[in-house]
Curated annotation (Swiss-Prot):
GO terms for biological process: glycerophospholipid biosynthetic process. It is a multi-pass membrane protein. HAMAP family: CDP_archaeol_synth. It comes from Pyrococcus furiosus (strain ATCC 43587 / DSM 3638 / JCM 8422 / Vc1). InterPro entries: CarS (IPR032690), CarS_archaea (IPR002726). The chain crosses the membrane at residues 4-24, 51-71, 80-100, 104-124, 139-158. It is found in: Cell membrane. Its cofactor is Mg(2+). Belongs to the CDP-archaeol synthase family. Catalyzes the formation of CDP-2,3-bis-(O-geranylgeranyl)-sn-glycerol (CDP-archaeol) from 2,3-bis-(O-geranylgeranyl)-sn-glycerol 1-phosphate (DGGGP) and CTP. This reaction is the third ether-bond-formation step in the biosynthesis of archaeal membrane lipids. It comes from the Archaea. Disulfide bonds: none annotated. This is CDP-archaeol synthase.
Length: 167
């Protein structure tokens, strides 16, 4: 597989996991409405259990479907593990970003350049690293193009009325 395609094929579960809570979310907040020592919400109402578990499921399923379509990994079980870890890492990275944004007193949905685009990506790569990784050049490519993809998908989600703001 060409290195550019390999990079995107590898990270696709994280991309899907990160974007699907916009559609699947709602319900009980992950922080259960609790506040941190600074009196601000830990994550906020926009980070919900349904969105987190939905994103984890979608990201993992995307990886399994990818493995069926094009066997990239030596086994389906490895594809499942890597996809699960990429999805989990993306969602945890997004939660960390929300936590930081709340500490900076930024409202939910407010853009934080770099944090929104790279936080989920770096966390996903770190979570999956013990099981499988990609070459450094492909990681660098993803660091460059992910902000553009993130911006484009946010604009699309806004136009589809899945998001109230285009960022």
């Amino acid at each position: 597989m060409h290195p550019i395609l390999e990079a995107f094929w590898y990270i696709l579960p994280a991309y899907f996991a990160n974007s699907s809570p916009v559609i699947l979310g709602g319900g009980t907040p992950i922080d259960f409405g609790k506040t941190w020592r600074d009196g601000r919400r830990i994550f906020g109402d926009s980070k919900t259990w349904r969105g987190f578990l939905g994103g984890l499921t979608v990201g993992t399923l995307i990886g399994v479907i990818q493995q069926i379509i094009y066997p990239y990994y030596p086994s389906l079980s490895l594809a499942f593990k890597v996809s699960f870890l990429l999805a989990l890492g993306a969602l945890v990275g997004d939660l960390i970003g929300s936590f930081i944004k709340r500490r900076l007193n930024l409202p939910p949905g407010y853009p934080a350049v770099g944090l929104d685009q790279w936080g989920f990506l770096i966390s996903a790569l770190c979570f999956a690293y013990p099981v499988h990784t990609i070459p450094t050049g492909e990681v660098l490519l993803l660091l460059v193009v992910t902000p553009l993809i993130h911006w484009g998908t946010n604009v699309l989600a806004y136009k589809m009325k899945w998001k109230s703001v285009p960022w």
